[in-house]
Amino acid sequence: MKKQRNLRSMAAQAVEQVVEQGQSLSNILPPLQQKVSDKDKALLQELCFGVLRTLSQLDWLINKLMARPMTGKQRTVHYLIMVGLYQLLYTRIPPHAALAETVEGAIAIKRPQLKGLINGVLRQFQRQQEELLAEFNASDARYLHPSWLLKRLQKAYPEQWQSIVEANNQRPPMWLRVNRTHHSRDSWLALLDEAGMKGFPHADYPDAVRLETPAPVHALPGFEDGWVTVQDASAQGCMTWLAPQNGEHILDLCAAPGGKTTHILEVAPEAQVVAVDIDEQRLSRVYDNLKRLGMKATVKQGDGRYPSQWCGEQQFDRILLDAPCSATGVIRRHPDIKWLRRDRDIPELAQLQSEILDAIWPHLKSGGTLVYATCSVLPEENSLQIKAFLQRTADAELCETGTPEQPGKQNLPGAEEGDGFFYAKLIKK
């Protein structure tokens, strides 16, 4: 029996770690969920994701409701009030229960003397909710994005930035990839139907299925046996451009957590795949995915900027470079990105991408294919990156994806219900 814990205080502390310490929610949340009962795991996730998704609004409201911000050791209370406001605004939790549990959270964070303050702020919001929300909806904070990112989106997409922002603020659908070595998509959809769930095939990506309602993976037919993998439709699009073939030597660079490594092997089971990532910890997930799907690949820890250190002079028939990026295309899936990224990160990431591209190109065979992919929507990391690479690389040729003036294919968040993603297919002359 798991000890009863105050979920509101746990959520407040998690959000504080993201915003104040720059930690990723995907690292913070799983250990916290291990401490609570199964029925509370989903609520804890909802509170953390929801507060981070609407952080601009909650911050704006607190500034209106309080004369002075909470600082120092009392800063966690600021986030606890956010959790309370989020429940009142966005959940079906009865207001009296939301208030009571949030106020009790002050004891869990060892600030019992502030219970009255928390209660007072939340009750004041209830009284003034209508006029506060009317004022908020006329402010720039209503877009729920940091101003630096909003400016970049407005500049890059003068006609589309609002729809991008809107898509980023939605909850994402759950996409799956059917393992074609086990089942056709249609036969697996029939199994899903028998299990009482409904799925929809993607029009363009042959293995992709969108669940009508997100479900825990253990409820999916054959998940433990590798029949299906959780992967967004846009990420699955990489295989359309890579087109791996049996017998080829293929490099998956920046491979963790291994979703694309295993997709290569589903499409071309007899390919010789090398999966490389700089992050040794995340490589454990590549091993886990290969094991669950019963597949084999050569997995290496290495820096994409220095390929000779981990592959010598080896050349590959195909290279998938899923480059490190701002992840601005997957904000709906990872709302903490809005608060982890900084404007100054973008030129630094673009420089890193450029260095990896230049370093890995000599390891592509003549006539070979390199697919450059990111989950970003920013031109500096995408079309401008590839345009500059083509200009300085005489034996590189753009293929099937865009034009030399506007290279690559950019999927925007929410288009065909997928994440924001960029692909460019390059051939070595």
Swiss-Prot record:
Binding positions (S-adenosyl-L-methionine): 254-260, 277, 303, 322
Identify the PANTHER family for this entry: NOL1_NOP2_SUN FAMILY PROTEIN _ ANTITERMINATION NUSB DOMAIN-CONTAINING PROTEIN (PTHR22807:SF61), NOP2 YEAST -RELATED NOL1/NOP2/FMU SUN DOMAIN-CONTAINING (PTHR22807)
Q: Which reaction does it catalyse?
A: cytidine(967) in 16S rRNA + S-adenosyl-L-methionine = 5-methylcytidine(967) in 16S rRNA + S-adenosyl-L-homocysteine + H(+)
The species this protein belongs to is Escherichia coli O139:H28 (strain E24377A / ETEC)
Q: Identify the taxonomic lineage of the organism of origin.
A: Bacteria, Pseudomonadati, Pseudomonadota, Gammaproteobacteria, Enterobacterales
Q: Which UniProt keywords apply?
A: Cytoplasm, Methyltransferase, RNA-binding, rRNA processing, S-adenosyl-L-methionine, Transferase
The cross-references to Gene3D superfamilies, in alphabetical order and at most eight, read: Helix hairpin bin, NusB-like, Sun protein, domain 3, Vaccinia Virus protein VP39
| Protein name (Swiss-Prot/TrEMBL) | Ribosomal RNA small subunit methyltransferase B
Q: What does this protein do?
A: Specifically methylates the cytosine at position 967 (m5C967) of 16S rRNA.
**Record-linked InterPro entries:** MeTrfase_RsmB-F_NOP2_cat, MeTrfase_RsmB-F_NOP2_dom, NusB-like_sf, NusB_RsmB_TIM44, RCMT, rRNA_ssu_MeTfrase_B, rRNA_ssu_MeTfrase_B_ent, RsmB-like_ferredoxin
Would you name any one GO CC term? cytosol
